Design a protein with these regions (language model features):
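Phosphate/ribose-recognition catalytic cores of enzymes acting on nucleotide-derived substrates
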Residues: 2-158
């Protein structure tokens, strides 16, 4: 079951991309990692967009403690897997648009189960992209400045 934010809103997180432990890269799903300064974002996997270098990229986005590797002891992190993208964007500031929640966080028995689910999440994100106008959340881009790592609701365009 998928959940959308109440129309006409999406959540936008602005943050600097930090180097992580490279685990996503080693299992075939590299991510742009943004620290989350506070609670308020719903943990789970989302379909959305990442603004980077003046371009928009579809992304499967995870927010949570990364329970497969760290249990509840891991610090919260936003990890965005940009589809069809392989550039190094460490230390760049990006905007991450959380548009549709795909599922909650869960712990997997191991890496094979996790990678199978990540592949399904990417497929679900691609399916979502086919139903969304690429410019929909950006047609009336908000003129807001937010602290790094803080999410703000933004009105979606019609």
């Amino acid at each position: 079951m998928t959940e959308r934010l109440p129309e006409p809103h999406v959540l936008v997180v602005r943050g600097g991309v930090e180097r992580g432990d490279q685990r996503g890269r080693t299992i075939g799903f590299p991510t742009a990692n943004l620290p989350i300064e506070r609670d308020g974002l719903l943990d789970g996997v989302w379909a959305g967009w990442v603004d980077c270098r003046g371009r928009r990229h579809a992304a499967a986005i995870s927010i949570g403690h990364r329970p497969t590797f760290y249990g509840r002891e891991g610090f919260r992190l936003l990890e965005a897997h940009l589809l069809d993208f392989d550039d190094d964007i460490y230390d760049e500031v990006v905007d991450v648009w959380l548009c549709q929640r795909l599922r909650g966080q869960r712990r997997f028995a191991g890496v094979p189960e996790l990678t199978a689910q990540l592949a399904a999440d990417v497929a679900a994100t691609r399916a979502w992209v086919r139903t969304e106008r690429r410019d929909a959340p950006f047609a009336h881009r908000p003129l807001v400045t937010v602290p790094l790592g803080v999410a703000v609701p933004v009105a979606r365009s019609a």
